[in-house]
């Protein structure tokens, strides 16, 4: 299911029947069209349309692009940062290890959403609103990545403590290999399996975090398609009869996260 969604989002221009962000293909006359199986529904809009007359199916496919881009990029950033700190802490030890682990423990007490909100708030205080809107995706990637790295650091450190006492590491030291080469050429490949497991789970959490931030209005700007943004605007019409504007993006997000 995940690869089907990924394929559709990458080739949205081919898969989606409409481009919902092209003014020429959107008409307000089509606004609030219900799904095809409901009274008043049309086959040209299988899942109905939103308040702007945009096809819901096409909008969700285009919106999943941002969620997947932010999810993948933020997890890669968190994995690089966390693995680097975890391996070096486990291999070097001493005060450096204590500092890294205490920092990890402190951050793990803070929920990821709150940490991402904090980083986003700091970014808004430093740069102008216009610049923030232009760099919203990069701010989101950094904010979510900063909130997710401790899990990678703890797993990497624990695995490194086991690996550094094995014979191949001792042999590498004897032949004069540098610590950097030992850590990232010999130890890292042997601890990748648990790291990739954490990354798989973290990707789903990153996508949900991005959608949550966009739903709260602190993620991508309203002009940028995102599943969280779609749910946010559809929420205004949930109890006025146009339930499909929120329902389908929410179901799509759940399926994407679980897949």
Please place each PLM-identified region on the residue numbering.
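Glycine-rich helix-loop "coupling/hinge" segments at transmembrane-helix boundaries
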Residues: 119-122, 144, 202, 209-248, ...
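Residue-level recognition of transmembrane alpha-helices
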Residues: 2, 59, 101, 117, ...
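Short helix-capping/hinge motifs at transmembrane helix termini and TM-loop junctions
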Residues: 12-20, 90-94, 119-128, 201, ...
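Amphipathic cytosolic juxtamembrane alpha-helices at the membrane-cytosol interface
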Residues: 54-69, 93-101, 161-165, 169-197
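Gly/Trp-centered helix-boundary motif
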Residues: 1-83, 87, 95, 109, ...
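Amphipathic alpha-helical segments that mediate coupling or scaffolding at interfaces
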Residues: 60-63, 67, 88, 122, ...
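Generic hydrophobic transmembrane alpha-helix motif, especially the helices
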Residues: 46, 77-82, 90-91, 96, ...
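Transmembrane alpha-helix boundary and packing residues in multipass membrane permease domains
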Residues: 5, 87, 116-121, 144, ...
